[in-house]
């Protein structure tokens, strides 16, 4: 009897060992999930904007060329504009950008606008006297008129602030370059006895530019945003126009000598305030 019990215990132990081993063999390993590859364009976005530039006042100066013979020939006075302004008008822009995370994004933008520019300078007292005018009265001034085409290429960075429903406010800043090209300048001397009318070739130049932005975007869809914002753009000063044909002449009615060359006038740059509306499409 004792021998039979021992054999039964051994058989039960063997069965238990085999069952445990089988159970170990049946342990299922947890699956390892690999992240799905991101689409090639994920994070990138395209943008397009239209805006309105408000009229902006600036400053400038121009040199008066004395046409008489040596030793008087040459620049003998420099006038500062009493009023120099860039008229308001539409602006247009496109850009491509990349979103790094929910807060930080950057883009490269190209913008264009064209605007009329006007300058006014009061005549000096000796100019008034030469026309037989009272030198202390406001009775004589110069007017300069042209148009300027301005392209800006900017690198910008933005911080998107916490969302409020479908709205995302943001702040931004940018640096870059502006290409300013003036049309022909029309100059007139305005007074009862004045007759001066002249055309002067406009200059073009590359200049440093910087910008500050603020605005809010509205989610039209998960990928398409309506952007409403404000931009302040600073464009550094540069050459505006050259001398007219009479100043460039070597021989004129007053004698002969070196003709004028190079820029006659320079502007002090522009401070441009713009309200803009645009669309931004983000790839996912």
Curated annotation (Swiss-Prot):
SUPFAM superfamilies for this protein: OMPA-like
Keyword Signal part of the UniProt annotation: yes
Signal peptide: 1-23
Disulphide-bridged cysteine pairs: none
Keywords: Signal
Keyword Signal: yes
Gene3D superfamilies named in the record: 2.40.160.20
InterPro entries the UniProt entry points to: OMP/PagP_b-brl (IPR011250), OMP_b-brl (IPR027385)
Family note: Belongs to the surface antigen msp4 family.
The protein, known as: Uncharacterized protein BAB2_0314
Organism encoding this protein: Brucella abortus (strain 2308)
